[in-house]
A protein has these predicted regions:
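C-terminal structural segments of small proteins and small subunits
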Residues: 61-89
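Short leucine-rich amphipathic alpha-helices used at interfaces
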Residues: 14, 42-43, 86
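N-terminal first-folded block
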Residues: 2-35, 39
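Generic detection of intrinsically disordered/low-complexity segments and helix-coil linkers/edges
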Residues: 16-19, 39-41, 59, 77, ...
Length: 89
């Protein structure tokens, strides 16, 4: 379910799991990446051509990080598809 706040700020939400919002900013361009926020923390993962790798992390517990990484890994195709649709790639 899309988060109205994210949409109002032009930040398309891809999905929400475990209390975390997975989204990207419309004005940010390459490299392909996804932001994650929730439970008082944030992270950013960039696509390296093979997988999403962590590039920023703040305030996310290890257990939550593992869940987030699993969600991203299992949904990489969806993330890439949504990115390409949004940026007309």
């Amino acid at each position: 379910m899309a988060d109205k706040q994210h949409n109002e700020r032009n930040m398309p939400e891809i999905f929400r799991f475990f209390g975390f919002s997975f989204f990207f900013y419309s004005k940010e361009l390459e490299p392909l990446h996804i932001h994650v926020e929730g439970n008082g923390g944030m992270a950013k993962f960039e696509w390296n051509g093979t997988e999403f790798v962590l590039t920023e992390k703040q305030g996310i517990k290890l257990n939550d990080f593992r869940k987030i990484k699993t969600v991203i890994d299992e949904n990489a195709d969806i993330i890439i598809k949504r990115w390409n649709e949004h940026f007309n790639k």
